[in-house]
Amino acid sequence: MTPPASAPRVITVVGPTAAGKSDLGVFLAQRLGGEVINADSMQLYRGMDIGTAKLTLPEREGVPHRLLDIWDVTETASVAEYQRLARREIDRLLAEGRTPILVGGSGLYVKGAIDALEFPGTDPEVRARLEAELAERGSGVLHERLAAADPDAARSILASNGRRIVRALEVIEITGKPFTANLPGDEPVYDAVQIGVDVERPELDERIARRVDRMWDAGLVDEVRALEAAGLREGLTASRALGYQQILAVLAGECTEDDARAETVRATKRFARRQDSWFRRDARVVWLGGGHRDRGELPHRALTLVERAVTA
């Protein structure tokens, strides 16, 4: 399904963590008279500020940022709910003649917003049974079952990610189809200009390490401690966020703070690689250099790309 030529434009700024997406989103919104719509699943949570690198109010430079701080840390993330909220914001901006700019590295959230993606329903009885089995037998056993039922899904879901494994098995049982059959293709709902920010791996790894250091120095441990008191540990999604999961382990006496800091760096580097792989599978994403040699030119190259697409 291809939108008609007159379909309004949506811009996405995607790529791995620490690539420089947020600043580029602010620049484009200022130049195009638009607003930023958050597409980072963990920035949806209230109070998760330091560890998600959420822009402060001064850093937003007056640009409205939508879909930040909308969920409590005890709530489980829902791509279907995000899709509803994001499309509402997109449609509002388009109706006002303004430019929606989705910014974030949560690939499924971006696709859910701009592509034709329908979510299978849920069955509380099936979900409860699978979650009980997860608690009793562990994610490894369920991952083996998923591998037998849908090898492609098993390859794309970490064996340690019990929540996603349970969801995949639930969908298979409800629909009678492989979980991957329900994953999004590239059928657009909106005519989108998709910009990927590309940073070479050695430089990106250095940025990630420095960012984690800044987060610790800015008080991430205290932020997690306060969120723990607000129910973070019980949140199935928020408690797994990078940095937060590791510090919760410190607060539980399971590791040292130095160990948690080092593991946060390692886990974030692995996560950045998975993000990069996800977005590179989408041929519609145009990649622009965001490394130190290109950083000064990135905003103007992105603006030129958008302007050419709009006038094409």
UniProtKB/Swiss-Prot annotation:
Listed cofactors: Mg(2+)
InterPro entries from the UniProt entry: Dimethylallyltransferase, IPT, P-loop_NTPase
Family the entry assigns: Belongs to the IPP transferase family.
One GO BP annotation of this record: tRNA modification
NCBIfam families per record: miaA
Protein's name in the database: tRNA dimethylallyltransferase
Family annotation (Gene3D superfamilies): 1.10.20.140, P-loop containing nucleotide triphosphate hydrolases
Self-association state and partner proteins as the record states: Monomer.
Pfam families: IPPT
Site, Interaction with substrate tRNA: residue positions: 106, 127
Binding site for substrate: 17-22
Entry keywords, A to Z: ATP-binding, Magnesium, Nucleotide-binding, Transferase, tRNA processing
EC code: 2.5.1.75
Task performed by this protein: Catalyzes the transfer of a dimethylallyl group onto the adenine at position 37 in tRNAs that read codons beginning with uridine, leading to the formation of N6-(dimethylallyl)adenosine (i(6)A).
Enzyme type, top EC level: transferase
Reactions that this protein is recorded to catalyse: adenosine(37) in tRNA + dimethylallyl diphosphate = N(6)-dimethylallyladenosine(37) in tRNA + diphosphate
Disulfide cross-links: none
HAMAP family with a match to the protein in the record: IPP_trans
Keyword ATP-binding among UniProt keywords: yes
GO terms of molecular function: ATP binding; tRNA dimethylallyltransferase activity
Family matches, as PANTHER family: TRNA DIMETHYLALLYLTRANSFERASE
Binding-site list for ATP: 15-22
